[in-house]
Amino acid sequence: MPTKGDYQPPKNGILSKLPESTVPYGELLRIHRPLGYYLNISPYVVGVAYTAAISPVTLPATFLLGRLVILSLWGFCIRSAGCAWNDLIDMDIDRQVSRTKLRPLPRGAVSPSGAALLTAFMFGCGGSLLLLLPSQCAFEAAIVVFFALLYPFGKRFSDHPQLILTNIAWAIPMAMSSLDMNPLDFPIPTLAMSFSIASVIVMIDIVYACQDAEEDKKVGARSMAVRYMEITDQIAYSLFFSGTLSLLAGGILRGLGIPFLIFSVGGHFVGFLRFLRASLGNGAKSALVESRAKSSCLLATVFLVFGLFFEYCVRL
C-alpha cells in the first residue's frame, strides 16, 4: 500500500497555492486537471451556442450569457463530484496502479467518509443550480447524475465503461431546454450534435486510458483500451470521423451555412486530428496525452463556438 512518505506535495500549479490541509481535497476534485473540466463544461457552451444559432426566434445575448454561466457551474460541480465518487469506488484498484496509487484515498490523506461527504456536497451544489433553470432540465440532469454514479462500476462489469461517459452529451438537450427550446422539436439535429459530443468524449478517454492499459489488465480493470488494445488507433479514428460527420449533419439539418462549415466543422476536424496524430501509437502511453487533449479540445471548442456565434450574429 502507498504511504504518505512516497508522496511529494505539489510545488507549482493551483494546488501549491492552497493551504496544506486542503490539498488532498483539491486533488480529489481534480482541480489541477483542467482537461476534465473542458470535457464537461465545453458541451454546455456548445449547446448554448448551437441553440442560439438555430432558434426560430432571436435569443437575447444577456439571456444566453446567464444560462451559460449557470450551466458551466453545473458542469463544474458534476465533474468535481464525479471525480470524488470515482476515487471512492475505485480506491482498491487505484492502490495497484502506478499512476493512481498516490491519490488522496489510496495514500490515506482523505478518509472514505470525508470523500463521501465531499461528493454529496458537490452534487448538492450542482442540484441547487437546477432551481435557476426550467423544470425540464431536471430530467436531463438526472440522467447525467445517474450515469456519473454508474461509471466507476462499469470497469468491473463491462469492457466498455467509456460508453457510460456519453452521458456528458446530454449537455446538448439540457442546454436547449434551459433556453426554452424543446429538443424533441428537432430530434435528428439534436441527436446528431449529441452524438458528435459523445464521440469526442469516448475517443479522448480511450486514448487517455492507454496509459494504464497494461496495469489495468493485470489488476482486472476493464476498459475499451484494454479490450481493443490492438486496434485502438482504428477505433479512435472511427470515432473522430463519425463525430465530425455528425457535427456536420447537426448544422446542415438546421440550415447553418458557410461560417459553421468553415469554423465549427473545420476547427473540430483540425483540432482533434492534431490530437490523434500526436497521441496514438507510441504517443498513447506518453504523459503528454492530457496536455495534447486539453489544447486540442480548447482549439476545437473555440472554433466550434465561434462558427455558431457567427451564425447567431448573421440572424440578428
Curated annotation (Swiss-Prot):
Q: Belongs to which family?
A: Belongs to the UbiA prenyltransferase family.
* Database matches in InterPro entries: Prenyltransferase, UbiA_prenyltransferase, UbiA_prenylTrfase_CS, UbiA_sf
Q: Which cofactor does it need?
A: Mg(2+)
Q: Give the originating organism.
A: Penicillium brasilianum
Please name the CDD domains in this protein's record: PT_UbiA_COQ2
The entry's function note states: Polyprenyl transferase; part of the gene cluster A that mediates the biosynthesis of the fungal meroterpenoid acetoxydehydroaustin. The first step of the pathway is the synthesis of 3,5-dimethylorsellinic acid by the polyketide synthase ausA. 3,5-dimethylorsellinic acid is then prenylated by the polyprenyl transferase ausN. Further epoxidation by the FAD-dependent monooxygenase ausM and cyclization by the probable terpene cyclase ausL lead to the formation of protoaustinoid A.
Which pathway or pathways does this protein act in? Secondary metabolite biosynthesis; terpenoid biosynthesis
* Miscellaneous comment: In A.calidoustus, the austinoid gene cluster lies on a contiguous DNA region, while clusters from E.nidulans and P.brasilianum are split in their respective genomes. Genetic rearrangements provoked variability among the clusters and E.nidulans produces the least number of austionoid derivatives with the end products austinol and dehydroaustinol, while P.brasilianum can produce until acetoxydehydroaustin, and A.calidoustus produces the highest number of identified derivatives.
Protein name as catalogued = Polyprenyl transferase ausN
Recorded hits in PROSITE patterns, A to Z, give: UBIA
Q: Where are the transmembrane segments?
A: 45-65, 69-89, 108-128, 129-149, 163-183, 188-208, 233-253, 256-276, 296-316
User: Cellular component GO terms, alphabetically?
Assistant: mitochondrial inner membrane
A molecular function (GO) held by this record is:
4-hydroxybenzoate polyprenyltransferase activity
UniProt topology in membrane: Multi-pass membrane protein
* Location within or outside the cell: Membrane
Gene Ontology biological process:
terpenoid biosynthetic process; ubiquinone biosynthetic process
- Domain of life where this protein originates: Eukaryota
